[in-house]
């Protein structure tokens, strides 16, 4: 059976259902006419993705889209059914995944590697697969298998590209399956590496990226290693500088800040800028929340073990609390009761919740919970240090 599947993946004419469903679509929308099935699929996928993102009428017929989804799901379930990926990543599979191939033959193992460690052609083919899964979560075999129960319970009515985001919304549930959470976190980390793998952010911030981050696009888009978090970091810095971002982009950047606050690896710039400080914090603490808090305390005490770039980035992480309190899980958790009590009528975002807590802490007639007051006091002190670091950096720049 696998041999026949491999044959049909190599030549689209051997895949009879696909041929019947998509023949006219291929003739109408794929010029010059591709011969390899991988090129046919890529052509159709790009057409479907463009129409979905731009919210316009689909050029590809419904029957062809359904068959295309089936073909993609097959391809993503086993590397042997993706000849182009298997060939491009042959050496990397041997080097990194010889003992960790799993049921999919090594696809997830390859995704776990840092982009720079993979050969350029392998990274290129793997990125194509990641894009397909980001634009249509129903072709993400590992996500569907690992989160089957959670998708059925929480996200069965969602559009295919919304499933991952829907799962993220419910992942705070204590009963959330750990196997599913592991896959979910892995996808969040992938998105953080390259903004093009986050279709919502890519769509919402397209004009903002052109306006503020075009130098990064020009420098890194042909490098083969993706953007390594640089585009999102550029947009975060733009937001922290109070420069005008489109409303939809600003919302996406806040969501990204929250992701990075909950999952340290979802901040590739932090990983790259603060390796020694992270090494120390990870040797002492286990959870992402505690590791992040460890970095902030080291920053406040002037004890970060890396250079100025690390100090600058941690200062921005501290400053992000002023942008949205959800970007600081420790403060948000410690002050949950007080936020409901004193700030329930304050609109979230733009530092309003943080400002509300600070205002309440100064009122003699109100008393914050002890833990909230303690964490808030530390944050105010950290914020003062962060403002000085960022101001000094601006002078040097």
What are these regions (language model features)?
Residues 1-397:
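Mature extracellular/luminal domains of secreted and GPI-anchored eukaryotic proteins, especially small
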